[in-house]
Amino acid sequence: MAIQQVGARTVLKVLGDVVRYRISPSFRHLILHVTNICNMRCQHCFVDFEEKPNDLSLEEIAGVAGEINDLIWLDIGGGEPCLRKDLAEVVDLFRAREISIPTNGWFPDRITKVAGAIHEKNPGRLIITVSLDGFEATHDEMRQKGSFQRAHETIRRLREIPGLRVKVNTVVCERNSGEILDFMRYVRDLGVDYQSLLLLRGNPINPLYRLPSMDSLRRLGEAMQHILDGYDFGRKGFFRSVLRNYQAVKWETQLQTLERETQVVPCLGGQIHVVVYANGEVAPCEILPPVGSIRKSPLKEVLTSAEWKDAVDGIRRKACHCTHDCNQQENILFDPRTYSKLLGF
């Protein structure tokens, strides 16, 4: 009974978010790149690193928090976020129902310390996502020699923090597609809360990295979903089953997007979703170019500018399409047409 009540409350909260957004649209999802510094140059990374990073100060980020703060999702990005020494203070500036921080796992001590500090103030809301792209040889080739073992140690230590949700992100590309199913079973046995499969996107540092063929992705899909169904996603009862269904809906939506070369579910980029980069530039999503900077204008001026409106109009007209997980999440959850599938009907 208690689990059913928790599930019902969660569903009602999500439905309330959707209704409020439809009545009065507002930004509920912020991707905040806290640093452009990274200790790796992963072969499949799409981030355009600056030679001389000029990261936002804590005061400048506080200005962002003062203008956009009542969030469902706060996604921290980079660079390698844990290289920012005041990361915990940055997170403290925001009110968010769910906080997600990715890491390449290279610094187990530093990551575990900051995760523990943030989790203590945000119990049940923090997810630490560690990147693992394949077994050791594959992962180290795609990222950096020795990175597999360090990421593995980071996962082990994070799992020792009671109540902290730990996730693995895996970029799916030709290089790891041959071992992906066995690797997914390996990750499941690590005891993490779940694994996200991210289709390669953007313009990788190494242009030889590409997506597997559509036939390969279709063949892998059912077996992948069967493995993902073994996770509880850090949840219980009804909402756990919804999250399992979501993985299947997301995968099918992404494949159809690639096949049709258009948006399958209308994209809310620039409407519910905003990206602030470490240098202050602002974009409607990580795929499209920036259209302003908080170092030149207050954030609200950027978000109400003619340039921003033009970018959003282009998204609404389906002038662009992508498989970006961060976008697909809100697109699916805020589209009532997906609810029958999410509920398993």
Question: How would you describe each model-predicted region?
Answer:
Residues 3-121, 125, 333-335, 344-345:
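Conserved alpha-helical substructure of the radical SAM core
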Residues 29-56, 60, 71-77, 166-174, ...:
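Soluble, non-transmembrane catalytic domains of enzymes that act on hydrophobic metabolites at membranes
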